Amino acid sequence: MGSLRPFRWSKSDRMKQVGTHLVVDAWQAPEDLLNDPEGIRRALIDAISAGEATLIDLCVHQFSPHGVTATATLAESHIAIHTWPEHGYFAADLFFCGSGKPEVAMKVLQTALKAKQVRWREIPRGFDETSQVNERVGEPIYETVL
């Protein structure tokens, strides 16, 4: 198997983009909001609607003594959120394909959970249209993002 090596799309690549992936860190949010599974469920439903996505399934889990994880399966892909109320922090992952608006959905989550600080990375998801299907078999291309 090949070694891990960074991969970045270059301007010369002809990427067929199939979606947009936001990887989010948010902090300075109130502990009570981040530990409220029903509030997080409502925030996700509002975010999905605002992002013009279609909800298929929603799973929310309350951890003990604190923390919530919620995953929403969308017709357009998914949203996942994990909270650490004791740190006023949540991590979210929004992957939308098609015409959905993940940035709008993220802003709704930020507002609903009252995070004062948010940082996200937008990653276009897709493949090189010029590559042969088996061109890179056995040679994984990964990027470790720190």
Language-model features, listed with the residues they occupy:
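Polybasic/polar functional segments that serve as interface/processing modules
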Residues: 2-146
